[in-house]
Amino acid sequence: MSAKPFILVLALACADARAEKTNFTSGLLAGINGVFDDLGSLAGGPPTVCHINCHHPDTIREALKKPATGHIAYLAKVRRIVEQQTGLPYAVVHYSQLSGGSLDRTRIKAVLITMMDKGISSNHTARLLATIRATNLPTFGFCGGHQKIAEAFGGKVVKMRPLAPGEKDPHPARYPGLFKEWAFLPVKIVKRDLLFDGFGDTVVVREYHAYEIKRLPEEFDLLASNDACRVQAIKHKSRLLYGTQFHPEHFDVEHPDGEKILRNFFKTAGILKPDTSTTERPTTP
């Protein structure tokens, strides 16, 4: 049996149905089969990458009707990236299974957090934020995960702004009437960090958002910014706890910076597999 460590991918998305998963017959996840692992089983299981999903169960049920697209395809993509970059297998847990110290009671060695849609309840959201505060594992949040990290420490997340009269909406189907970043866009590095090792002053990364962190908690440093959204990348001052407003998991041949940023995180966490490359076309989450 390999002695490689766990990674926990705290993801606010859906799950890859390829691996063997738990079938839930009761509770919030009733009827969602072949998607989630049991968090408790990871404590004594083999080293793995675990992706914690924070979407509403109804969103997941709807996504399962078209598994080749949307959230299911997105999770399959994240699985490929993580497994190829780290050499570790991959599991998925729903955020409703979390309690404050549940991550640290496993053999998990790192955490990734991605997007979130509508919450289940204020109690479940509070448990997620408590888990983020409690864990000492290396952690990296993307987009909605980045925002939840800030909220966990008292930060404020707001809509960016309304569209100006005559201003073009790059994606009217999502957040209509709001200004949004919705493309590969340049972001300026304002504080050097290992997350941006090997880059110059700017990275070009995929944005999908209409909300932003307006008030950054004092426990965090600002690492990257642009004119449209000041808080593009953050790091906790005393922990390996990162967030990016952009999506590093979305990259392609013409825009490879996200792949390198992920590699830098895995390297910082001590789990990077040497000589990995996973460049591919992006998939909308």
Regions inferred by a protein language model and the residue ranges of each:
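A short, charged/proline- and glycine-enriched loop
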Residues: 42-49
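Short hydrophobic segments within beta-strands
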Residues: 52-55
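Boundary at the C-terminal end of the N-terminal hydrophobic targeting segment
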Residues: 15-19
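Sec-dependent signal peptide recognition
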Residues: 1-9
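Glycine- and acidic-residue-enriched helix-capping/strand-helix junction motifs
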Residues: 60-75
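Pocket-forming structural segment of enzyme catalytic cores
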Residues: 154-237, 246-256
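Acyltransferase
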Residues: 22-40, 58-59, 246-285
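Flexible gly/pro-rich beta->alpha loop and the following alpha-helix that scaffold active-site loops
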Residues: 80-142, 153
